[in-house]
């Protein structure tokens, strides 16, 4: 297993060049992609050009950022100047952004090597990456199963070691749930910590960009690089960003951890519950105090989310009309063109959510649904506020199950929505959440542990996650087919 720090040392010690590292990863992608299908667009020429610049820097004796020369993948809903950005939708199949998102610009400036854009559920709407308008990504642990979603391509690419780290976006669990299914670390930061400028919007009050890595340290290094104030994002927080690496400690003495009672109810697989309980015992052994916490409004998270998120999506997706960018269908009138373009360009799940949102925002139902959902959102946030008065970090399973078979839930949207039961309330409250591997089921599929922190307490999440990771070896296991 190759970490950012290991590759950095190889570069600094001149054991390998950045071009050699990039070439190795590009070859690995070529070998594995026919089966995993993590990517929508590969950027080998860009990767080698970026690697060459890093080698030139080394030759000049200049200091390197930890991410310089590190192969990284980007979810294909992040705008990249001159590189297609499709959001896995047919409506944007010919779209090449004229500008760069803030996070990808930061990575370019630091010398990271971009190997490609990863697959996702169309416009980030889904929990399995099966809603992509192009192809379905496979889970590297079992190619017949889904990698989770919507950032399934990024999670699968990291798990298959097609890149070292990757970026995803999380609106209701879209980083944490695929991290759980693919056995990697995934973090959704506090809302506003990372700029959303250049992230194609799904639900603007919930979306947040975050890192995937195979270790907690790799995720911490990547978050450090992308976090920070951006005047181009009105929701960006103007606060200093700490060095997250300093919080990677191994003792949890004095730390109070709360177990969310409501996440251990009906629908939770027994094997997942057992793995999480064993993880709690390990956290206790590391010095943490464990207590049960009740968040009674947690169970309203799913219905609240499926009113608020589609409402925001129906507004955000109104811009795809065949006029400004994306595909355009031939038609006799403007209305006809809108209708044909959107009917052909959007997939079934996106259409479903647009209709849901348009319905809940309509005059007769606005108060009954949208306004009520916003009030319930406040109550969910209050539950978390109350919990954090007595504990530092909250713990739950990341997802009620391990990865399911491709095609198993596509006919039943409600059963698919339940995959994000544990993750959604964290987005509604704007809190940071991290998923890391805490075991495997009987079929060798990874199980994820979710840690939830108070606002801007990513430091505590990294502390707890790193301590647990160092005391276990789940993160060292690799999918057998990728070796």
Swiss-Prot record:
Active site positions: 75, 150, 174
GO cellular component annotations of the record: glutamyl-tRNA(Gln) amidotransferase complex
Keyword annotations of the record: ATP-binding, Ligase, Nucleotide-binding, Protein biosynthesis
GO biological process: translation
Description of how the protein assembles with itself and partners: Heterotrimer of A, B and C subunits.
Family assignment from sequence similarity: Belongs to the amidase family. GatA subfamily.
Role according to the record: Allows the formation of correctly charged Gln-tRNA(Gln) through the transamidation of misacylated Glu-tRNA(Gln) in organisms which lack glutaminyl-tRNA synthetase. The reaction takes place in the presence of glutamine and ATP through an activated gamma-phospho-Glu-tRNA(Gln).
Record protein name field: Glutamyl-tRNA(Gln) amidotransferase subunit A
Taxonomic lineage from the root: Bacteria, Bacillati, Cyanobacteriota, Cyanophyceae, Oscillatoriophycideae
